């Protein structure tokens, strides 16, 4: 690709089909708003047309240009990017639904970065960098990634420090929860629930009398299957409560009625983990080896709750039981989480923006100085 003269501002292209009320944009919107517009020019390439909502309006208003490319071909989008002289193209999708990865195969920008949407390597030499952290990709795991790694100093995941939690006060009765009894919660999508995770959950429910498991209702088929599997394991199906979908701010508010978020593995919570932590609900996770199995651990480390990260299934089960069986311990953890939220890095969007902008400046300068692409650590 022919090298252009540097723009006065570093021109960043963000590419996604999810600039709307979607998990990705809930995390990213405040980053777009916080970007230093005196140093960076932001251009959005939206792969999806659709009605406006509050998040889409916030996102589109934060860009210098917001371009709907839904009807354009991959080749046309790639050429448009080159015509606009994008310096750094940030792919927010990877291989997730409605992606347009061929845009990057055709080299839409001299520097191409994989971030957030896809929890792993692209496996392609067309992507130069992947944004991660030391929890997600330990040094010994770098060999499994085709990209060079941009290591953020804390968690790789940005969050919206202005995210709204509804003032609505739900009662347990209206949400189908018992007035008494411990509420285990997991609002991950049901495809993440593996048989061996479900085995552990059912054993925990047998050990904690009167406890219930609160899950998201994905589909009637999923509800029926999980109820059948609970019965097979000797747990009454009506002890599994399914939460209907609701607006995001109210969904965050209803987290207050849960006692403990118990994570899935090997595919752990991502946005759902930060949802829980933002709502002051502790999360117990089991860290694995892959990127997708280490995200909750990254978030818990950044919020100062690494003691909730376990390494084995037995540790996961025993720590969860210990917390569920000890009200004072649970209260101590919740107090620590509430205390840490305003002072730790996880929900500090301003600090995250400063760090990612430092990364963009470094990779831009290296490109124009003909320095080879290599791993970068932001401090």
Predicted region positions:
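A nucleotide-sugar donor-handling region in carbohydrate enzymes
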Residues: 1, 124-191
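Conserved nucleotide-cofactor-binding alpha/beta core module
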Residues: 1-127, 134-142, 210-349
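Non-catalytic membrane-proximal stalk/linker segments that position and tether the catalytic domains
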Residues: 1-14, 18, 160-174, 366-379
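Conserved donor-binding/catalytic core segment of Leloir-type glycosyltransferases
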Residues: 10-15, 178-194, 198, 356
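A conserved mid-protein helix/loop that constitutes part of the nucleotide-sugar donor-binding site
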Residues: 22-30, 190-203
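A structural alpha-helix within SAM-dependent methyltransferase catalytic domains
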Residues: 198, 202-206, 317, 321, ...
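C-terminal alpha-helical cap of glycosyltransferases
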Residues: 348-377
